[in-house]
Regions:
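Histidine (H) residue identity feature
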Residues: 27-30, 82, 110
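Ferredoxin-reductase
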Residues: 36-107
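Generic structural "secondary-structure junction" signal
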Residues: 8-15, 73-74, 106-109
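An N-terminal, well-structured beta->alpha segment
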Residues: 1-65
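Conserved small/polar residues in nucleotide/adenosyl-binding loops
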Residues: 2, 109-111
C-alpha cells in the first residue's frame, strides 16, 4: 500500500513504489514548480540509488536543472531549498520504515 502524506509518499520498493510511480511524481513535481534548481538527495537505503536515478533522469528529460547532493540527512535538502535560489527539493527516504520501504519526500519553497 502506497502511503501518501503532506510531504510525499512511502511504499514497498518495486511493489507500491516502482518506476511508474516515481516517474508519475517527477511529472507532478515538474508541473507544479516554476523554473529553477531542484535539489535531490537520498538516505543510505540500498534502493535509494535506483530511485534517485529514475527521478533525476526524468526531471532532466523534462528540462529541469538538478543539483544532486548524494546521501544526506533530510534537513540538508530542506536547508538548501530555503537558503538558495532553488525552487524545490526531493529526498529519497522512508524515515523510520523498514529497509524494504522507501519514499519520495518533497521540500518546496511554497510550504
Amino acid at each position: 500500500m502506497l502511503i501518501r502524506s503532506i510531504s510525499g509518499i512511502r511504499g514497498l520498493v518495486n511493489e507500491d513504489l516502482g518506476e511508474k510511480t516515481i516517474i508519475k511524481y517527477a511529472h507532478a513535481l515538474h508541473d507544479y514548480l516554476q523554473d529553477g534548481v531542484i535539489y535531490v538527495g537520498r538516505d543510505s537505503r540500498p534502493s535509494g540509488e535506483e530511485i534517485v536515478e529514475i527521478m533525476i533522469n526524468e526531471l532532466i528529460k523534462l528540462g529541469r536543472t538538478i543539483m544532486y547532493c548524494g546521501i544526506v540527512p533530510t534537513p540538508t535538502i530542506q536547508y538548501m531549498v530555503h537558503t538558495t535560489e532553488a525552487i524545490g527539493g526531493v529526498i529519497i527516504t522512508a524515515s523510520h520504515n523498514p529497509i524494504e520501504w522507501n519514499g519520495i519526500k518533497l521540500s518546496l519553497i511554497h510550504i
